[in-house]
Each structure stands twice: as structure tokens, then as C-alpha cells.
């Protein structure tokens, strides 16, 4: 919930015209992102699998591309859909997902979020 909230707030702050689809692995995460300003929200495997097909960018924890991560909430179908979608993926190295990204200096979560959104804007030509 917290990471999604921070991502939605930062994207809306930097790109107020952006349409944000909050695709949560659980209803609390989805509700938190909607409350933070996401335009649409849905929860579970099928919304994630279907939702990433049309996305320009996907932002989230690194665990969204690892099956069974985030306490088992990421299904193999979700991980495959996110990893294989055409969208550019901007992933936050959150070690609680069970994945350690070597060489990444530990930073406060808001710093990672700001960097991910900045990189997304540059790569998608929004900066």
C-alpha cells in the first residue's frame, strides 16, 4: 500500500494529466492507490494480466516480476504478464520482496520513487 501510494502521488504531482490505473495485488493496496489519486483501480490476477497489456509504463516493486513474491500475492501469471508486457518497467528495489538487487545503495523509499518517476518521464519523453 505505501509504495503504491507514494508512486501515485509522485506521478500525479509531476504529470497531472497522466491516467493512472491502480492494479493492486490486494484490495487494501488498490484502495490506498485510489485514495492517493489513481484514476481507476482493480484488484487481483486478471486485472493485472489484462491491465498491463495496454500500459505505457509499469511502476512498482521489483517483486511484481517474480512469481510468489510479496508474501505470495504475485502469481506466476501476474509476473509473466508484467515481465512480458510491452510497457517500460520502472521497478523499485524493495528487499522485502525476497529479491536483493546487488549494487543498489539502500535509500529511503521516497528517493527510489522520485528516481523511478523521473526516469520514466525521461524515457517516455515527458520530462
Residue ranges and their predicted role:
Residues 2-60, 64-127:
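A cross-family phosphate/adenosyl-ligand binding-site feature
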Amino acid at each position: 500500500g505505501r509504495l503504491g501510494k507514494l508512486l501515485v502521488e509522485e506521478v500525479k504531482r509531476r504529470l497531472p494529466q497522466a491516467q493512472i490505473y491502480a492494479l493492486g495485488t490486494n484490495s487494501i493496496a488498490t484502495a490506498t492507490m485510489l485514495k492517493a489519486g489513481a484514476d481507476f483501480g482493480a484488484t487481483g490476477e486478471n486485472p493485472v494480466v489484462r491491465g498491463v497489456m495496454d500500459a505505457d509504463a509499469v511502476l512498482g516493486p521489483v517483486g511484481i516480476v517474480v512469481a510468489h513474491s510479496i508474501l505470495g500475492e504475485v502469481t506466476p501469471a501476474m509476473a509473466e504478464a508484467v515481465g512480458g508486457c510491452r510497457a517500460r518497467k520502472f521497478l523499485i528495489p524493495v528487499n522485502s520482496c525476497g529479491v536483493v538487487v546487488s549494487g543498489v545503495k539502500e535509500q529511503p523509499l521516497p528517493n527510489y520513487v522520485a528516481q523511478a518517476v523521473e526516469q520514466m518521464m525521461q524515457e517516455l519523453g515527458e520530462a
